[in-house]
A protein has these predicted regions:
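A short, small-residue-rich loop immediately preceding and capping a beta-strand
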Residues: 21-24, 45-47, 65-104, 272-280, ...
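Glycine-rich, anion-gripping cofactor-binding loops and their flanking helix/strand elements
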Residues: 82, 215-301, 401-429, 443-447, ...
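N-terminal cofactor/phosphate-binding cores enriched in small/glycine residues
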Residues: 2-82, 88
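Active-site diphosphate/adenylate-binding microenvironment
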Residues: 8-13, 26-30, 34-35, 346-430
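Phosphate/pyrophosphate-binding active-site segments
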Residues: 1-3, 292-390, 496, 506-552
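Glycine-rich, acidic loop regions that bind phosphate or pyrophosphate groups
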Residues: 101-150, 241-348, 452, 474-475
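Thiamine diphosphate
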Residues: 100, 107-117, 394-552
Length: 552
């Protein structure tokens, strides 16, 4: 059974031909023709999520793991606007998301008809392409071209696209067969390594005594990992890897803030690189950003397949290619240089690690101690999803097992869809997925649990410090008389939500109970699990601030 409407058939046929394998559908009437068609297509998996914001982040989590476009489908009106947070995240995180919205015909917009808004180009500031279709036989070729271009861009450029599909009534008429349509191939410019002057870059690199490579959000890549081994062998190269980089090396600095906190001006000058190479997504560490803005390298090269990012206001070279392609070609033009740059700072790193371990031995029960316990307990070869705000910042202070793949919504750094993203990732990746989140982030996206596709091996660890802990850590909020509006203190727990959504629920409130509850937490179960850990909100910030003083 398929929709009788030809425009709906064109959209469905295009998605099938462009290998869109998954469509997340939110209920509505105006999108009925597409819902009927997608749900009856034998090569397209359809998933139902009611809340559009949760649906979009759920789809984003699937696309994050599969590295393939995932479509989301909704009805007309404000339903579409609920997609925006996930679209912005996809835009800045280079995740392919195909947004398909049903709409009223143009003659019904802005005349007082129900459930209508101005949907055309509504995401124009955060979308790679917008296809505004017209339901009319004479526009069939135009519609096919726009749909084909949108899907091809989503596939080739890894980002969100929007297809707006207006339907007039009737909406529920069906036919038995789906017509196959042809879609013209749109010629898109491809990445061309021949345009990169490797010889010039090699000369600059080879003459520099201090080279730094800084890696942001990055999908696990075995080939890139091997290439980094070659650069780590050069004693004039210092590699900084964020928690979300999924790159591990014993000669890399993986806890950036731990190293550079409270360095003196003289030490910062010694750390300042001559050449800086950056690749990957957004950088979490504010301290490394501040350092590289205050002590700018002479040469900053940013590598990205799509867009340049001048994070430190000193970009000298945008290298538009994939990092793995750049480093594999660049190897032929570089020569290792003897320098004490790497060894000096690795020694410094090791000294900080010793102080880190010593501090943790005597630490009071707190967010900090909970992170040590939780991160150490995560099983090998699983996937770790981390929410934003203080949670990702605590995680950055620890070395996490190399076999664990780590993800976080750092495109826009919002707390709004972390739970739904983690659920989508857990659905797509059959590895056990562990999601560590703060209380505000969890409750903000608690509707994400209203999803029938959550696997039984999914685990959530909530660090509940009764409010926004980040606002006690960062300078500023504590100096005002409006603290409650920043930290938003509360007495909520996840216990009743867990029962309502069929999760097993556990709780802990001390070092001993955390250890006890973690013992069997990751074992096979029939239901997903939540472990809620309550920490003392009054002491967490002091313990963290004391930590940075102790490791100096």
């Amino acid at each position: 059974m398929y929709p009788k409407k030809e425009l709906a058939q064109i959209v469905i046929s295009a998605c099938s031909q462009f290998k869109i394998e998954t469509v997340v559908i939110s209920p509505g009437s105006r999108n009925a023709p597409l819902t009927i068609g997608f749900s009856n297509h034998n090569k397209i998996e359809t998933l139902s999520v009611v809340d559009e914001r949760c649906a979009a982040f759920f789809a984003l989590g699937i696309a994050q793991q599969t590295q393939k476009p995932v479509a989301i489908l909704c009805t007309s009106g404000s339903a579409l606007l609920n997609y925006y947070p996930a679209i912005a995240e996809a835009f800045y995180s280079n995740i392919p998301l195909v947004v398909i919205s049903a709409d009223r015909p143009k003659h019904l917009i802005d005349i007082g008809d129900g459930q209508t808004i101005r949907q055309e180009n509504v995401f124009e500031n955060h979308i790679l392409f917008s296809a505004n279709l017209i339901e009319n036989e004479k526009y069939k070729t135009r519609n096919s071209q726009l749909i084909g271009e949108a899907l091809q861009i989503a596939v080739s450029q890894n980002g969100p696209v929007h297809i707006n599909v207006p339907f007039d009534e009737p909406l529920y008429e069906t036919v038995e067969e789906l017509t196959t349509f042809s879609f013209p191939h749109i010629s898109l410019s491809s990445l061309d390594n021949s345009n990169i002057d490797y010889e010039k870059l090699g000369n600059i690199w080879n003459s520099a005594e201090k080279k730094m490579i800084l890696v942001g959000v990055n999908y696990p890549d075995a080939e890139l990992h091997q290439l980094m081994d070659l650069y780590a062998a050069d004693t004039s190269v210092l590699i900084f890897t964020e928690t979300t980089s999924n790159l591990h090396h014993d000669k890399a600095i993986d806890s950036i803030d731990q190293l550079i906190f409270s360095l003196t001006d003289a030490e910062f000058k010694k750390l300042k690189p001559d050449v800086l190479i950056t690749f990957g997504g957004m950088i979490v560490s504010k301290r490394i950003k501040r350092f590289l803005r205050d002590y700018q390298p002479k040469h900053h090269w940013d590598i990205d397949a799509r867009k340049a990012t001048n994070t430190f206001f000193c970009l000298s070279e945008f290298i538009q290619t994939k990092p793995v392609d750049f480093f594999s070609h660049f190897n032929q033009f570089i020569t290792p240089l003897q320098s004490d740059y790497q060894s000096k700072w690795l020694t410094f790193r090791d000294e900080r690690r010793v102080k880190h371990a010593a501090y943790l031995k005597n630490i009071k029960y707190s967010d900090f101690s909970v992170f040590e316990q939780a991160l150490a307990s995560i099983p090998d070869n699983c996937q770790l999803q981390i929410s934003n705000s203080s949670i990702i910042r605590y995680a950055q202070l620890f070395s996490i097992k190399n076999s664990v793949n780590i993800f976080c919504n750092r495109g826009t750094s919002g707390i709004d869809g972390s739970t739904s993203t983690a659920i989508g990732a857990a659905f797509a990746n059959k590895k056990q997925t562990v999601f560590i989140t703060g209380d505000l982030s969890f409750f903000y996206d608690s509707n994400g649990l209203w999803n029938s596709n959550i696997p039984a091996n999914f685990r959530i660890i909530i660090v509940n410090n009764s409010g926004g802990g980040i606002f006690k850590i960062i300078p500023g909020p504590g100096t005002t008389n409006a603290t409650k509006y920043f930290t938003t203190p509360h007495c909520l727990t996840a216990e009743h939500l867990s029962k309502m959504h069929q999760f097993e629920y556990q709780k802990a409130y001390s070092t001993e109970t955390v250890a006890k509850e973690l013992e069997g937490f990751f074992e096979t179960s029939k239901k997903p699990k939540i472990l809620e850990i309550f920490t003392p909100s009054a002491e967490n910030d002091l313990i963290l601030k004391t930590y940075f003083k102790q490791i100096q």
